[in-house]
Every structure is written in structure tokens, then in C-alpha cells.
């Protein structure tokens, strides 16, 4: 592939620069920004600026013709993404956005995990940003108030969840407090240390005020219904997939997929422990096996790092070509304790490597590797680290927008789930315990498809759900979703509770994993079949290289680009 910078690239790069101007937080997370001492403007005026920029950029794209296939993908992807952003803004979604995992209060809190702490200037920037938390959350409150005045308020369950997180951030377990009292601050000038402490206290107080606003002002206006309805759900589904799917067909496919995975797990349970041992019993026994246990976060971190490094070494040059900057991944324990596991991409110059984070719930001290080995492949190589790292690495082929700003869950999470199954197919999960963990991960994602569409579109409970103890017939709701989840997924209750709240508050995102994997496997199989028809040898490594070189785009755009 050889692509010369074009007029289309110039528009995309200009758009990226303007987004980073509007969002210093995005500038810091990508490594492209110059302002590292302020947070974003989350007020209605601040949010509207993005919509104006989207409209202006789409108008510019209409005036320029693509010069090659790379340009064609850029134009198609930008029209799809920016057009959808405008639709979401028209519907008031950015103003009302509030959930337990991906809304403003978490974005502000988690940004501080990414900020450099090497120099005095780095700490001065952190200090300034801590002092800016009050203003940033104040803008968010303005937006939530405006949405509420229009009758648009998140479900009460999400308001309560975020209020709980905000109280936590205001209290003694605050990540702000941990940050400014870390050993690294001891070498700083006393005046800066004092200011850091004062601004951390201010940031904590801002979260306390935010929690109070949520509980006293927003919660009384919030409804108890978790489902968002078919119309809103279809819009969210497009946001996370970059494709329009048949929700009813996908729901039935999810049920079938879940049944197939269950059959696989039953067979593994039999191989592990003999006839008559159920999947649930096998999972319980695996948890009790010392060979699959890590004790304490230090041991967990070491195991994560060793597993991730082994995957890089074993896959490079065989099934993937991994550029040198991507051969480094850093495994970290997150300062927060939400129960999530996530990846943050490298900075533009790779001075900050890609990182895998484990946010360990308070009180959790034993970690089961049979269940989490597949997660390391999902977040690391060949999952998110390879995919997002390649996007950053391909500076000569992809413009700034495609390298840094375009992220579609169905593409990205679909790839990471595809990577999990691929690692099993390549022999990395032949240990029966590890294989059970991979299948359990696949089962979770298939269950999400059924649960998410079921709850949010108000479907009747399927027979397999209605038959569970204490459930019965009726429409999907939180309690039946919990029964479905606990029946289908082997995770600690703290993790599962967070997961369910996430599905209820972030409609359309959870199915993107399995639906995205479905498309990735379909595209790969189509490419292999085409090669066979033409009498050519199919190279999986070449397919992966070509697919990852496109970067993260909507699934409809990806299929078109690879066909």
C-alpha cells in the first residue's frame, strides 16, 4: 500500500486538530495535545461545539474527490461517524449521558491514570487539572439539568450507581488522594506538594457536590425503567457497530450461539472431571485448583505481564508481523476499584506504551488464571494492543483521525473477541482449564447479545430464561436479566453486578463484541473461500495485516473495504 497525503487527509487532520482544541483530555490521551493543564468543557455550549464542527467537516468533504482507496475509506468512515454524531446530538443523547462506566465523571477520574508523572512540569499539569475538576463537573451538571428540563434523564439505577462512584471519589479511597500522596511526589518542591494536596481536596469536594446533585436533584426526576426502547436502541446499536442490524434476527442468533457454546463447555467439563459433572460444577472446581490461582495484586500483575510478553514473542513473525514499538505492553493495576479490565492505547510517539489495566474490586485477593488468560489475549496481543497500536503506528498510511479518533466498538471489541477465539484455534488455549475460560468469555458475550436486546427493546423472556428458578414468563427486566447472567456466566458477584449495571446503562455496546466477532469471522472465511475458488493459498497473516491496516471503522465500511 502506498498512499500520498491528500486533500481528504488534510480535512481529516484539520478535524482532529480542532477536536483536540475542544478536548484537551483527548489531546492528552492521544499524545497530540498541547494543553495539559485543563479539562474539557462538558456544558451544553461545549458539547454543541462538536456538532458544529461535525457539520462543517461534512460540508468540506462534499467538496473534495477521493484520490484512491485509502481516501474512499476515510470519506465513508467520516460520513458514517460524523453523521451519526449529529443524529445523536439532535436526539439530546450527549446532554443526558450518564452511566456507571462511560460518562463524564468516569472520563475525568480515569484521565489522571494516564497522565505522565516524570517531571515537575508533569506534576504542575496534574495540579492544574485537579483544580479544574470543579469547573468540568459543573459543566456536566449544566448539561444534565438542560436534558432533565426536556424530560430526558438516565434511569434511576444509573443515577444511583454514578452517585455511589462519586461519593467514593470524594472519600478516603479516592484515586485523587492516592495520586497526590504517592512516593513520586516526595521529591517535589513543598509549595507544589501543598498545592497538589489542596487541589486534590477541591477535586474530591467537587465529586461530593456532584453526588449530592445526583441524589437530591436528578434522582427524583429519574424513572425506574432500565430499557430505552427500540427507537433509541437502534440508534445506539448503529453507534457501536457502524452498521444497521436486524435486531430480532441478531437476538435469535445470540440464543443459538449461546446454546452452541454451552454444548462445548459441557464437553470440556466432561474431559476435565468425568461424566455427570455440570459446567457450573466444573467452573467451581477450577476456581479451587491452586495451579490456576494468583494471590495478591503483585502476583496478578507479574502473571499478566509474563502472559502478555509470551504472546508477543510467540505470535510475531508467525501469524502476525508486530512492529518493534508494539512489542512492549505494560500491565498495570488501576487505582480505581470498579471491577473492570481495560486497555489504553499508546501515545502518538510511543513514549507512553499501550497499557492493560485491571481495576480490582476492594477485598478481592485471589485471581483465577484459567478464567483470565483469555482476557490478556483480548486486551493485549493479538487483541486491542495490536489493533490500536497498529493504528497509531501507521502514520504514513493513515491520517490523524483514522489513527487516533475513529473508534468503533463493533470493530475493536469484535476484533478482540475474534483474537480470543483465534488464540484457542492456534493452540494457545489447549489446557482444558484455559479453554473453559475462553469459552466462558465467549459465553458472556453471547449472553450479552440476548440480554441487551431483550431488556432494551422490551422483549418477552425466552423459554430458557422463563424456566430458571424464580423467573417465569413476562418481559425482560433487571431481575430476570440478573438470573440469566448468573446462570450463564462464571464471574465473581462484584464483577457481575458491575457488568449488569453497565449493560442497563450503556445500551447497544455489550452486543458489539459478539456481533463484531461474527462479522470478522465472516469476512475472514469469505476471503479464504475466495482464495480457494481462485486456486490460491490463503495466508492468515496477510489477511490480518491487510485488515488491521484499515484501522477502526464501522463494520459496514470494513466489509466494503476488504471486499
Each model region followed by its residue ranges:
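N-terminal maturation segment of proteins
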Residues: 1-563
